[in-house]
Amino acid sequence: MMRALKTWWERRRAKRQLVADDARDLIERDERTAYYVAQRLAARARFRGDGTGFMHWASVAAEVARVSPIAEMDMRTVQAIVDEESARSI
């Protein structure tokens, strides 16, 4: 039981580190648009049917929102991004 718990915890920690690393990379590239880029990648994964990728990039977007004081986060822009990606996937 303890071994399974330890394995789960290590996997969870590795995933959180990957999310933090990807968020940091997006912020370093362009802090203002990092949230939108992560949302676009989440939308692409969603419309490809990649649930794991969607969850990852949605988590990255949340991490960008958490750590960046200047990242833009307009919901109308996010909706436009989702609509664009939806149209591309058809």
Positions of the model-derived regions?
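Hydrophobic/aromatic side-chain positions at a characteristic register within alpha-helices
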Residues: 46-49
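Long, non-catalytic architectural segments outside compact domain cores
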Residues: 1-39, 44, 65-90
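TPR/TPR-like (Sel1-like) alpha-helical repeat modules
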Residues: 55-69
